[in-house]
Amino acid sequence: MAVSVTKEEMDYTIKPEAGASNISTEDWPLLLKNYDKLMVRTGHFTPIPAGCSPLKRDLKSYISSGVINLDKPSNPSSHEVVAWMKRILRAEKTGHSGTLDPKVTGCLIVCIDRATRLVKSQQGAGKEYVCVIRLHDKIPGGEAQFKRALETLTGALFQRPPLISAVKRQLRIRTIHESKLYEFDNDRHLGVFWVSCEAGTYIRTLCVHLGLLLGVGAHMQELRRVRSGAMDENNGLVTLHDVLDAQWMYDNQRDESYLRRVIQPLESLLTTYKRIVVKDSAVNAVCYGAKLMIPGLLRFEAGIEVNEEVVLMTTKGEAIAIGIAQMSTVELSTCDHGVVAKVKRCIMERDLYPRRWGLGPVALEKKKLKSAGKLDKYGRANEDTPAKWKTEYKDYSAPEEASAHAASESTAKEDVAAALTTEQDEAPSSPQSKMDVDETKEEKKRKRHEGETAEERAERKRKKKEKKEKKERRKSKQEKEDSDDSD
């Protein structure tokens, strides 16, 4: 407990620095551990007084961004246990890392409120089990024969879910990574083994297959999950009673230390991911779904590959999102522009950090030109746009052909319409020509909405929806009046 208190009291934050850091970060918590070993793109950034270290969150935020490594008891189902947790902690949402059968015990990661966004990633993570198997008869080869059979059942295996399972009984392929025999008693027909496997593996089916291999038949007697994803039973495992007592202590004694001990920050599930540290000024843009670009990058881990899942984090060690890397470590070290990662699952709340986009010199110049009417409302060039802007400004968000077309386009709408009319008069009407006209209309429509911001798109869609609803109301009113007249 003394260690956790000390960790909460200390200030764990990446500070702006001119040279290499001399601080040892081996004992720093969660995502900041060994951050000094990360590769540095730049040490310069402006810290923003927003957000805080995961261990220093106020209790409400700590619980709503927390996970519990629960020791599931035997008999209740996983869904029942999670529902009880929701009621005990008075949370809005809870989720778990993968179903355990009612009789199975062990690690069940319960995610609370904001942390439920990580449920999908944890359900697909690897699992480890310890199983007690009961054979239906003695085997002549004894322990050696059992070991051989266990080794045979490694790698990719065909499995069909047991009858007891509440899922469709389809044949599926699951991988057994490793297995070890702990104990075997041929006289009592019992064996205990450990297995590391892919998510969705049925150990009950594995036991039946072992029995078939040994030629005597077998079934699963008992099962315990000892690891689920990033958490194992040595990593702060708590019981339902611990959670109930911790909540009672807070309600009656106002002592939150027990709740902080049973609940861990959601960042503890992401320690196995490769890290990318984001500048404070870029955090809120990523929360709104923006891709992380090179200027917003501070540090990154070695060995990142393209399309690999990474965790985007703040300088205070908070997880922002799970992203898909768009550049490898080598490219990140050498490039000065481009997309670093795109967001797969956003974790952090929006507007926890202030908005900082649109405040650069180019963005401010663009705003001035838009307000002066020298750019259209979507920021695209028109006939009044200065030649210097057309040549120097590069729009990275727009497709190259579209921006080139927009820059070179000087024909008035009337001329285009006149040209189209002339072509229609000259050419005989055919299905092909109609299709061409339709394509032209679609292209025009697409270009008209190109380059608009998320807020402008949302506003346009809202107006369109209101117009549609108004039209439907008018239509239904007209139909009602017509029916009244006919009566």
Swiss-Prot record:
Start and end residues of each PUA domain: 273-348
Compartments, as annotated in UniProt: Nucleus, Nucleolus
Cross-referenced SMART domains: DKCLD, PUA
Protein name per the record: H/ACA ribonucleoprotein complex subunit cbf5
Superkingdom assignment: Eukaryota
Listed GO CC annotations: box H/ACA snoRNP complex; microtubule
Record gene name: cbf5
Reaction(s) the record says it catalyses: uridine in 5S rRNA = pseudouridine in 5S rRNA; uridine in snRNA = pseudouridine in snRNA; a uridine in mRNA = a pseudouridine in mRNA
Originating species: Aspergillus fumigatus (strain ATCC MYA-4609 / CBS 101355 / FGSC A1100 / Af293)
